[in-house]
Every structure is written in structure tokens, then in C-alpha cells.
């Protein structure tokens, strides 16, 4: 499914994204390596075993990136002018290797662009849940989207 144009969104629209993903150890190691994050809590099984979690936590950059990435097909694919910002990013529960994550997006604000008559600004609340239905990540995202061509 392609993303929606600005004028195809209504405040309150909610999308449950069809893509879910089971997190692997390779995912966690790659994102930690790519972002130069040597935090033992993510990559050192022995060190992580001594924490309250008892095992490595998945790097939150992966969790956030996956949540936003799986939303693109249903929200902004082919209609995005620019991402304007992310806000209120939280990680209420940890993610572990083997967790399966699913995400949803809800349109929470719309406004016309003052400087671009062919575009508008959309704000979504993005949420990601593990296989137990526990909220593991959430944020708001604001983007400038094209209006539907005439």
C-alpha cells in the first residue's frame, strides 16, 4: 500500500501496520555496531546477565527505527516532502532478542502548510508492542506531506 496524501488523512485515523518483526541477535549487534554503541547492556551477555534484566536489551535505536520503518508503507511512502521532527520518544518496556514487534500509527493533528500550498503537516502518534501486547516504544512524528495532485 502506498502512503497517503495530506488530504487523505483525518484526525483519529488509525493504522495497524501489517509488518511485524521478530528481533534477532544479529539485528541488535548490527545496530549497536553501526551506531558505535559499545554499551555492554546490549552486546555483552555476561555483563547483561548481572543486571536486573538477566540478558542483553535490544538497542533502543533499533526498536525506534523499526517502529518508524514499518509505518512508511502506510503513511508517507511516495507522499513525503520532509520529516519535520519526532517528539515524546519513550521506551516503557525493554525489548529482548526473540521478541516480535508490531506497530500502529494514529493521526493526531493536521494543518495546512503556510508556505507550501501543495502540502500539509501531519502529526502521528506511533506505538510499538511486543508479542504480549506490552507497549515498548512510542513517539509523535510530524511530517510535511504532498497534497493529492489535481
Task: For each feature predicted by the language model, list its residue ranges.
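Hot-dog-fold acyl-thioester-processing enzymes
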Residues: 1-85, 149-150
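HotDog/MaoC-like acyl-thioester-processing domains
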Residues: 1-11, 91, 95-100, 104-150
